Structure formats: C-alpha cells, structure tokens
UniProtKB/Swiss-Prot annotation:
PANTHER family: EUKARYOTIC TRANSLATION INITIATION FACTOR 2 SUBUNIT 3 FAMILY MEMBER, EUKARYOTIC TRANSLATION INITIATION FACTOR 2 SUBUNIT 3-RELATED. It catalyses: GTP + H2O = GDP + phosphate + H(+). It comes from the Eukaryota. It is found in: Cytoplasm, Cytosol. The keyword Kinase does not apply. The lineage of its organism: Eukaryota, Metazoa, Chordata, Craniata, Vertebrata. Member of the eIF2 complex that functions in the early steps of protein synthesis by forming a ternary complex with GTP and initiator tRNA. This complex binds to a 40S ribosomal subunit, followed by mRNA binding to form the 43S pre-initiation complex (43S PIC). Junction of the 60S ribosomal subunit to form the 80S initiation complex is preceded by hydrolysis of the GTP bound to eIF2 and release of an eIF2-GDP binary complex. In order for eIF2 to recycle and catalyze another round of initiation, the GDP bound to eIF2 must exchange with GTP by way of a reaction catalyzed by eIF-2B. This is Eukaryotic translation initiation factor 2 subunit 3. Residues 76-80 are annotated as: G2. Residues 48-55 are annotated as: G1. Disruption phenotype: Morpholino knockdown of eif2s3 produces morphants characterized by hypomotility and morphological deficits at 2 dpf. They are shorter with a curved tail. They also display a significant reduction of head size and small eyes.
Length: 472
C-alpha cells in the first residue's frame, strides 16, 4: 500500500500531503485543509420517495454513481447504503456572480484549479468536502437512518416535480428526520424540466403546505433538474452557506461502525500476496491512523456446549486507510472510510463484518445480549398506501414474546420481547451487539410480510457478556 512505511501519503501527489509524524489531533477541524483535501467531513443524507431522483442528484453533484450493485442497476433502485463524496469549490474572483462562483467535483480533483468561466479570473478553491449518504428509499432506509449507522449533519429532501406532494414515503422520511432531530434541510424540487411553469408553482405551494409545522418548515426549496444538471451550483451554494460546519470530536478514542466489509483478494492469488480484509464504515468520533492496533467487537460469535453465546473480539492492525480512491494516513469522522487490516479475509468477505464496531484496543463499549429500553411507538404505520380516505393502520402495543427486528448501529438482529411495561421493554437479542447505554435503536414489526418501522427506543441498561480472549 502506498506510503505506510514512511508515515506520509504517497498516492495522489496533487492532493495535500498527510504526515503522521507532525499530526496534532487537537488542532484538527472539519475544515482542516489536510483532511478535506482527501476525505469528506460533512455527511448529507439524501431522502425522498422512491424514483424521485435521489441517486441522480448525487451523481449530478459528485459525478459518482452510487448504485454499484448489479441487482440495483437492473431494478433502478438503491438497496445498500451508497456513499459518494464531492468537493465543493468557490471561485476567488469577487466579480463573478453567485451562484456561478460555486462548483462541485469528484473527491480526487485537485484542491485548486483555474477558472474556465469567460470574463473571470482567479482560481476555484476548495471550501467543503461533503459525503452524500444515498439511502435506499424504502423501509430499510428508515431503520438505517434512525439507528445512526451514519452520522448525518443535514439532509436533502427530494420531491419529484411531476407527481403530487406528498407521496407516502416522503412523509415517512420527514418523520425519521424529526426523530433524528436533523435541523438542516434543503428541499429539492426535482424533474422541473418535465412540468410546465404553472404546475411547478402549484407544487411549490403543496410543498409549503406539506412541510408546515414539521422540522422542514422554512427550509429553502430549490427547483432543479438532476438529469440536465440545472441549478446544481445553487445546491452547492446552499451546502456551503446554509449547512453549518458540524462540531466533531477528534480527540476521543476512535470508533467506527462497519457498514460494509469485503475480501479484496482475487481467486487464485498467491499465498504471499494475500491481503487482509477491508472494513468500510463511518467514523463516529476520534481519528484512526495507519499502523494503529485495532479491536473489533463483538468479533467471532459462537455458542458453548450449553448453548450460551460467546464472543471473541478480533485484534488486528491498520495497514491502510482510504476514502474513495484517496490514500489517507489518518481518517477523521465523515464519509465512508475504508480500513485495510490484517484480519483474515474470510471473516470480511461479502459484508460478514457488518454491524461490528471497530476501534482502539480496550476502548470499545460492552457487548450486550439483552437490552432494557425505554421506547416510543409511532401512532400509525408509515409508508403504507391507504385506500381513499381511510387512515393508516394503528400501531399495536408491544406484546410479550413477540419477535421484532431491532436495528442498532448498522446491525439488524431479531429480538424477542421478554417483558413489557408502560414505556419500558426488555428485549432478548438473537445476536450479541456492541453498543452502549443511551444509544438509539429502531424497532420494526412484521406486518403483511414486510418489516415496518413501528417505533424507536433508547437503551437504559442490559445484560452484558464478557468476551473471551485467547491467551496465546
């Protein structure tokens, strides 16, 4: 891997050089040039009804197609979380009118490049590096959004101009934003090229009425066409000026939630050339460094002869870090970070490590097998199309011994309700999970053959298991 011997990044010479020997974590900010040159530091979720153009908008801004999997391309829907990074630039020529002075490019573009707008001079300079978390627009999304597998700082809410507003999932997503307490929202009225001006104005009124009284009230509404890249620079301007730079914790022990993992070795590879497994995820806090020792919890889960769950955390070392195609020497919170490790690649292949937590040795939270939560149920089922003027089905109370799907971090696992009181419930988990008291979890119930979000909860306490560690 480039540059892991010398402690400086050798890949991408046109980007800012990172040097581990001079790194002072306490001086870093989400706008430090050495970080935003190579990785994103602000996460923006794209949400909205299916086929309203979320992935297309991300592609228009970043140049990255987030739909990477074959079955997604065929069905034209996003199934897994897609991440795409984009650098936002501003021209340093004051005579250039806004919004033309803003521009977005892919994450490996140089930090400065000369203007190509006739009649202007100067350079485009990097001002933000954002990561778009392109969520699948269905129920999975709800769970993914709620359980904080991705730290989201802001959201782009997409509404297609050629359909009436609101569509069922749009209201569901607004509910999720409310629950997550996301305050910074931009509403994009997409597909504006398909409608007449009068229709666009009429829908603008509908959108205003729809967001009234919600967390999105007062959010700017920008008419765009993602396919024609119309008004995309306006979106860039709003990203720079309307979304405040988040406060990040760079000094704590690092922690990363794994949302993807893979084996990068090709079949038939020589034994000496084998590379360790790669885990991808979003860093919640702290800074990961190349060469650092790391621990993954819960690790390898098995049952002993009595059928009790056992966990064996995995210990390893970071050999490389990267964000999209950029090599890193250290990685901060924001965007999807790939962590190259020395872990046995078979443990990582095909997303096997999803739901695990990776961090500094000895600094990770407890492993729980049972949780006691205080929970809140939604009044009605969301996102279910209702006939005519019928109200959506009410959410039934939790009952003892029913099985729910629980989403914690990036882990989805079954959970049996073992006891339930007014607003407290005890849940026995099918798989152990590494988490801590105070974390939010999402609860889903099987309704008509689909998992539907019914509420969310917060961990109050639980039953933990002591991980087993080999003495060798």
């Amino acid at each position: 891997m480039a540059g892991d011997e010398s402690g400086t990044t050798l890949g991408q010479p046109h980007l800012y050089k990172q040097d581990l020997s001079t790194l002072d974590v306490s001086k870093l900010t989400p706008l430090s040039q050495e970080i935003i040159s190579r990785q994103a530091t602000i996460n923006i979720g794209t949400i909205g009804h299916v086929a309203h153009g979320k992935s297309t908008v991300v592609k228009a801004i970043s140049g990255v197609h987030t739909v990477r999997f074959k079955n997604e391309l065929e069905r034209n829907i996003t199934i897994k979380l897609g991440y795409a990074n984009a650098k936002v630039y501003k021209l340093d020529d004051p005579s250039c009118p806004r919004p033309e002075c803003y521009r977005s490019c892919g994450s490996s573009t140089p930090d400065e490049f000369p203007t190509d707008i006739p009649g202007t001079k100067g350079n485009f300079k990097l001002v933000r590096h954002v990561s778009f978390v392109d969520c699948p627009g269905h129920d999975i999304l709800m769970a993914t959004m709620l359980n904080g597998a991705a730290v989201m700082d802001a959201a782009l809410l997409l509404i297609a101009g050629n359909e009436s507003c609101p569509q069922p999932q749009t209201s569901e997503h607004l509910a999720a934003i409310e629950i997550m307490k996301l305050k910074h929202i931009l509403i994009l009225q997409n597909k504006i090229d398909l409608v007449k001006e009068s229709q666009a104005k009429e829908q603008y009124e509908q959108i205003l009425a729809f967001v009234q009284g919600t967390v999105a009230e007062g959010a700017p509404i920008i008419p765009i066409s993602a396919q024609l890249k119309y008004n995309i620079e306006v979106v860039c301007e709003y990203i720079v000026n309307k979304i405040p730079v988040p406060v990040r914790d760079f000094t704590s022990e690092p922690r990363l939630i794994v949302i993807r993992s893979f084996d990068v070795n090709k079949p038939g590879c020589e034994v000496d050339d084998l590379k360790g497994g790669v885990a991808g995820g979003s860093i919640l806090k702290g800074v990961l460094k190349v060469g650092q020792e790391l621990e993954v919890r819960p690790g390898i889960v098995s049952k002993d002869h009595e059928g009790k769950l056992m966990c064996k955390p995995i210990f390893s070392k970071i050999v490389s870090l990267f964000a999209e195609h950029n090599d890193l020497q250290y990685a901060a919170p924001g965007g999807l970070i790939g962590v190259g490790t020395k872990i046995d690649p078979t443990l990582c292949r095909a997303d096997r490590m999803v739901g695990q937590v990776l961090g500094a040795v000895g600094a990770l939270p407890e492993i729980f097998t049972e949780l006691e939560i205080s929970y809140f149920l939604l009044r009605r089922l969301l996102g279910v199309r209702t006939e005519g003027d019928k109200k959506a089905a009410k959410v039934q109370k939790l009952s003892k011994n029913e099985v729910l799907m629980v989403n914690i971090g990036s882990l989805s696992t079954g959970g049996r309700v073992s006891a339930v009181k007014a607003d407290l419930a005890k849940i026995v988990l099918t798989n152990p999970v590494c988490t801590e008291v105070g974390e939010k979890i999402a609860l889903s119930r099987r309704v008509e053959k689909h998992w539907r979000l019914i509420g969310w909860g917060q961990i109050r306490r639980g039953v933990t298991i002591t991980p087993t560690v080999d003495d060798d």
